[in-house]
Amino acid sequence: PQMLSANERLKNNFNILYNQIRQYPAYYFKVASNVPTYSDICQFFSVMYQGFQIVNHSGDVFIHACRENPQSKGDFVGDKFHISIAREQVPLAFQILSGLLFSEDSPIDKWKITDMNRVSQQSRVGIGAQFTLYVKSDQECSQYSALLLHKIRQFIMCLESNLLRSKIAP
């Protein structure tokens, strides 16, 4: 039998997953305290912070953060979220989101942010998609459980509502 892709499995099981997800209560994420500022992470080369390895090397326009002990043990199959922020608001947006990005409850084990000091204003990432959140499955065969899908959805909604509440422009 032919193996279905993760996307095909999600489509085929949409109604089942949707009904399972609806049964979960709202999820509240513990916000990390004493998080570095955007200016701090732009100056780091490599540092461990709250279980995340932060790397900012000169050959890249991105600052990468990767959880040392990932929560999701599945494979990365290309699923990601981009959050685009007006260039001049990236430092403030990072300040607003960093407590969640570094949260021990975050379902995101790996993310990156553009180092705006290293990128051309006219480049794709200089204009938008400054945050990239990488999502990994939590089951075999790159499948997502209903619980993880719920947690990811709640996390993204929390990030968005924090940005909206702070009047951060896309």
Curated annotation (Swiss-Prot):
EC number: 4.2.3.-
Predominant localisation class: secreted
UniProt keywords, alphabetically: Lyase, Plasmid, Secreted, Virulence
Keyword Secreted belongs to the record: yes
Descriptive protein name: Phosphothreonine lyase OspF
Subcellular location: Secreted
Gene3D superfamilies for the chain: phosphothreonine lyase (3.30.2430.10)
Molecular function per GO: lyase activity
Family classification: Belongs to the phosphothreonine lyase family.
GO cellular component: extracellular region
Function of the molecule: Catalyzes the removal of the phosphate group from the phosphothreonine in the mitogen-activated protein kinases such as MAPK2/ERK2, MAPK3/ERK1, MAPK8 and MAPK14 in an irreversible reaction, thus preventing the downstream phosphorylation of histone H3. This epigenetic modification results in inhibition of the transcription of a specific subset of pro-inflammatory genes, and ultimately to a reduced immune response against the invading pathogen. The diminished immune response enhances the bacterium's ability to disseminate and multiply within the host.
Organism: Shigella dysenteriae
InterPro entries associated with the record: OspF/SpvC, OspF/SpvC_sf
Keyword Secreted: yes
Domain of life (superkingdom): Bacteria
Enzyme class: lyase
